[in-house]
């Protein structure tokens, strides 16, 4: 299964739509905040093709999206958050505490605008970077394991 991971679109709706169209085999789209309005428009446009899971970011003032989502996808427990509540700009310590206490296999976060793919102590930590800058990510969950890939839209 391919999962598309997006974050920090910051009003760049075009980038959001291009990223979704660039990954036609993605079955699930995670949006990690700071662009809730664009996310809601993408859900409206693409929900007949893909499942959408979103969380709010620190810039998403008027949304009902949760700040944290934990669910099992393809037999892997995935935690999604924007990251500001876990102070990710100052390190991953708080995020790691949440991941371990919730027994997660994969942690998705944004906020820093910096792509990151890290495997530590049995947990994958993945930040797709800022979609406003053309960064996004995909995660492939296969029988062989988990592969996290940071990508660029190549539209700049």
Predicted segments, located by residue:
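Charged helix-capping and loop-helix junction motifs
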Residues: 90-99
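N-terminal active-site segment of His-dependent metallophosphoesterases
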Residues: 1-49, 60-62, 66-67, 141-144, ...
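Helix-adjacent hinge/juxtasegments
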Residues: 51-88
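Short secondary-structure boundary/capping segments
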Residues: 44, 68-72, 115-117
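Active-site environment of divalent metal-dependent phosphoester hydrolases
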Residues: 10-14, 36-40, 59-64, 86-91, ...
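Binuclear metal-dependent phosphoesterase catalytic core
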Residues: 2-3, 100-103, 120-156
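A short helix->loop->beta-strand "cap" motif at the edges of active sites that frequently abuts
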Residues: 48-51, 123
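Active-site neighborhood of phospho(di)ester-bond hydrolases with catalytic His/Asp-centered motifs
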Residues: 5-7, 29-34, 53-58, 79-82, ...
């Amino acid at each position: 299964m391919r999962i598309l991971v997006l974050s920090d679109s910051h009003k760049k709706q075009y980038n959001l739509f291009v990223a979704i169209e660039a990954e036609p085999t993605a079955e699930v789209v995670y949006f990690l905040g700071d662009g809730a309005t664009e996310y809601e428009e993408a859900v409206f446009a693409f929900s007949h093709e893909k499942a959408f899971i979103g969380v709010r970011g620190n810039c998403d003032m008027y949304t009902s999206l949760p700040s944290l989502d934990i669910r099992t996808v393809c037999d892997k427990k995935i935690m999604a958050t924007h990251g500001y509540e876990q102070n990710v700009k100052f390190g991953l310590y708080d995020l790691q505490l949440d991941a371990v206490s919730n027994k997660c296999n994969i942690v998705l976060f944004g906020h820093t605008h910096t792509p990151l793919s890290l495997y530590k102590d049995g947990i994958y930590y993945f930040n797709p970077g800022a979609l406003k800058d053309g960064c996004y990510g995909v995660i492939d969950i296969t029988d062989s394991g988990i592969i996290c890939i940071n990508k660029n839209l190549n539209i700049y």
